[in-house]
Amino acid sequence: MTMDQVPISRSQLPAHLKRLESESIEIIREVAAELKNPVMLYSIGKDSGVMLHIAFKAFFPGRLPFPLLHVDTTWKFRDMIMFRDELAKKLGFDLLVHTNEDGLRAGINPFTSGPSLHTHVMKTEALKQALDLHGFDAAFGGARRDEEKSRAKERIFSFRAEGHVWEPRNQRPELWNLFNTRIRPGESLRVFPLSNWTEFDVWHYISLERIPVVPLYFAKERPVVWRDGTWIMVDDARFPLAPGETPQLRKVRFRTLGCYPLTGAIESAATSVEDILDEMRTTRISERQGRLIDTDEAASMEKKKKEGYF
């Protein structure tokens, strides 16, 4: 199956999801029309899946006018990489995969290097390398304002100065649906079509549109160890066990996905999208509770974004 053959769902969306979908389509089309060389960042998660699905709708029955980019740290869950490769083969989109080879040669990893250095080298620097290598002037991301406080104040069209630097005080006003896409050479934009969506909106949309997601989002018995106040999955042989530490099988799932040593699971019985929606109706805890990279230092997410992070 190729992109121009992708079936578009005809589900009856509720009014608020229709409004969010229309806004996202308008944003994606605006970037494609105004920027010279955009790219869509694909992290393999649920938000990326929704953003990609909406992009298909925006240009159906034509092909996507931009490639997808996955920054591969080499520490993603195996299920994520398998899902990525199968989806790319099925839909036939143009997928670029970039890894910071300098970081690999230096032996940077989540265990001995720590979350901060690993994230900076293998995610932030790798992303900037890929954007510069291909000359992309705009990058779509699946971030939402309800995820985290620094993202809550970021514009939909997030202006990045030369070197991909984000300065919150220099962001441009966004009045209604009017966006300023003008940039000088060396400058770029990060664009977030799902800014106004919530986690519940995303899962509700996935349910109605029947969008496939990585199986890690659903509860299953998995080998985990208790570290840093959360369950960490032992996904491959590279995981160094502490003295006396033994993986145990627990029925867990993930609300957010990243590098497996830095992503905590939650105990859950949710084995379907409908179960997840039911679970979310009662939860009062942020989905990013399991992201260890968000808790490594004060204001860490804003600091990372200023350095060029997603």
UniProtKB/Swiss-Prot annotation:
The keyword Nucleotidyltransferase applies. It comes from the Bacteria. Keywords: ATP-binding, Nucleotide-binding, Nucleotidyltransferase, Transferase. Pathway: Sulfur metabolism; hydrogen sulfide biosynthesis; sulfite from sulfate: step 1/3. It is an enzyme of class 2 (transferase). InterPro entries: PAPS_reduct_dom, Rossmann-like_a/b/a_fold, SO4_adenylTrfase_ssu, Sulfate_adenylyltrnsfr_sub2. Transmembrane segments: none annotated. It holds the Pfam family PAPS_reduct. Its EC number is 2.7.7.4. GO terms for biological process: hydrogen sulfide biosynthetic process; sulfate assimilation. GO terms for molecular function: ATP binding; sulfate adenylyltransferase (ATP) activity. It catalyses: sulfate + ATP + H(+) = adenosine 5'-phosphosulfate + diphosphate. The keyword Transferase applies. Heterodimer composed of CysD, the smaller subunit, and CysN. With CysN forms the ATP sulfurylase (ATPS) that catalyzes the adenylation of sulfate producing adenosine 5'-phosphosulfate (APS) and diphosphate, the first enzymatic step in sulfur assimilation pathway. APS synthesis involves the formation of a high-energy phosphoric-sulfuric acid anhydride bond driven by GTP hydrolysis by CysN coupled to ATP hydrolysis by CysD. Belongs to the PAPS reductase family. CysD subfamily. This is Sulfate adenylyltransferase subunit 2.
